[in-house]
Amino acid sequence: MKSIKYYIQKMLGNWLHEPIIPAEKTTGFSLVRSERSETNMGKNANAVAPYYLHNVQLGDYSYLAKNAQVANTKIGKFCSIGPNFCSGLGVHPTNGISTHPKFYRGEMVEYMPVSIGNDVFIGANVTVLDGVTIGDGTVIGAGAVVSKDIPPYAIAVGCPIEIKRYRLTEKQIAAMERIQWWNWDEEKLKNIRTMFNDIDGFIKKYDV
């Protein structure tokens, strides 16, 4: 017979991780409860609680590890995003008397959308600033602050962000962008597993 302790833990766990749909955009973040508003989750997409999501599109099979704080961000398909991810949370002016929104709210642009492509891998503790575009197939190293656009299939790290190299050659990148395997149906996606390490063979077969 299960103990009373088990049922108490189960009850508390369900309560702590119960999603909340706020009436309007919230400005805080709870370490134990999750908040989601104006957010679309694709097929088999997942966000691990706790999280704060506002005006987010999370593509098919993409996931956010715990403690994500994301707003005004479009995330493509098959993205793998590590814990403590922050994106699109707004900008503060630095050329005025104050940086506090009390003095400029409604008078200027506070948010600019973020776009993250497909098949993007983002490590732990990464922050993406407003208005940034991250291309398909990109890798962002842990702890990076992404303050500028990152082209497809780049490997970028650091603060300030710096492109170290590219995952593929220029010709391979162009071919992958034409193939767009992330838009395939379930049956066709099985071919990626069978050809996983044969990039040139994969391109030769499907870049037609």
Stretch-by-stretch model annotation:
Residues 125-138, 144-148:
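Beta-rich strand-turn-strand
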Residues 154, 162-175:
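Conserved beta-strand-loop-alpha-helix hinge in the C-terminal portion
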Residues 68, 85, 128, 144-146, ...:
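Short coil-to-beta-strand initiation/turn motif
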Residues 149-153:
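Gly/Pro- and small hydrophobic-enriched strand-loop and loop-to-helix capping segments
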Residues 1-119, 126, 170-208:
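Domain-scale signature associated with acetyltransferase and cell-envelope carbohydrate enzymes
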Residues 61-63, 78, 119-121, 137-139, ...:
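Residue-level marker of beta-strand positions
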